[in-house]
Amino acid sequence: MQYWRLALALSAGLWSVAAAHAQPVEYEVLATTGELGPGMPPGWRFTRFDQPFVDELGRVTFLAQFNSGQAVYRTTGIDPQVLVRTGETPPGYEAGDELGSIRSLDHVNRAGDVGLEAWIEFGDSSPTLLGTWTYKDDAGLRGVSFGGLRAPGTTSVMCSGQAHWYEYLMSNAGHVAIYNHLCGTGGNDRQGIWASDENGENLRLVILENRPTEILPNTDVVFFREPQSINSQGTVVFDAFLEGDGITEANDYVYCAWNAQNGYSVVAREGDPVPGFPPTVTYEQIEGVRVNDLGHTMVWATVEGPGISEAWDQVILSDRDGNGLEHVYREGMQAPQQPPGATISYISDVYFNNKSQIAFMSRVAGSSDYFWSEGGPPGLTFVARTGQSVPGFDEPYVLTSFQTYETGGGYGPEPVFTDSGRLVFLGEISTQPTDPTDTRRRYYISDAAGELRDILPPGTQLDVSSVPGSPDIRTVDGKSFRLAGSANDADQVAALAYFTDGSSAVVLVSYADACLADVNGDGNASPADFSAWVAAYNASASGCDQNGDGQCTPADFSAWVINYNNGC
């Protein structure tokens, strides 16, 4: 009878179902406030941690604070190991020169290379300098650039103090791109971008404000912002306003790519024809450009021309298929997994990973914000939207807004879009309409099974003890604002946990691969799971959706067979 019902169901269409089994999650506490700091003087205990990062080897790097100093640690599977600490002489410096306060730990790339800002204090009483440093396993700690020292390619010096305008990026190979201003004689507070080689050495001038440029013939650069991206080949992407021959308000804004081997190339320019559209359709406003480690480019822009209206004037282009820039997504398109006629509008915050997958935010015929991603099943899929219920709380909470980093805003890091297609993002939630003033900030990840997961749900109990047989259980505080530093392709997230007793810890959150074929949940893929899948199909229940398209259809039977043959 069960199989007869299955046959009827297969001919009856499809149902929306709950997502398949969520990925199992594990928590590993790596360091806790109050503990003695490994590799530090006797009695030095952790007092605070700053933003942690996880690399592709699953190693977590974090900045630890002590009462009398700081250290950058990396976990190695045993105890955290000190990479950099204050009070020591960096390689290449003289005895008496010491690393002073570490201002910030800013970057850890896929290979585990570190980017940080710190002061160097000189034993001969020379002025203390604030610099950008890198740490690589094969090269150790190196200074890349310092405020107060000459800026390469100029006769002026880098501004000191790393003011609000200062930004730098690090590639997955270790290149550094720096955005700063010039100070001192002849500096005139001009903007500049500089880039290093993969060891943080040989810093070169890329572009300087109010100076002739080779971007276009007979033009000067009058303004630009911080670099938008740098890839593992050292290609730096930035935007610029130009003036000079043939430059008007309609074509003075360009996005450029630069590297040490090939110099400049124009990626997109306002007023130029948009690839894939009639020649009369041009770029009105270029919102963003990224170049990934494969050398592929993504352009997000507003276009104008005959046949273009405000309802469909935003586009996302890419050359990822090897055919040059071409249209991938466009405002006005049908929104995936939404009712017919529900269309994408107001595209914003576009992300491009190193597999050339795209994720972005938009509206859908209303006031809700949606997050979409190519990281799950084939094609663009829904990740989250404002107004939806979120996991992690006993009482109903809804996602009220996505929050991304704003300089000085204190919101936290940008969403992470990993090369495995996961999205990690910060959201503001509340109990609207019950109590809209009860707002909290939480970090979420879209897991491999398509479920939205609170990275460290409130009430989670973690054993912070490092002594076998002597547990020390602490409870995650639901009101804490945490920084989730990064995520890797193995579905691991580095996070800070704040506990109800006021202590905190660095935690590695790992999501194991979900065994989709294990429909009955006994931990094994076995013939019994076929009967369980049939029952799930007939009930439109969790476990039916084996291909991750958010639906329960006949295609899921073939997907279950594939998942079963792949094993668990």
Per-region residue spans from a language model:
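Intrinsic low-complexity/disordered segments
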Residues: 18-20
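Cellulosome-associated attachment modules in secreted, modular CAZymes
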Residues: 511-568
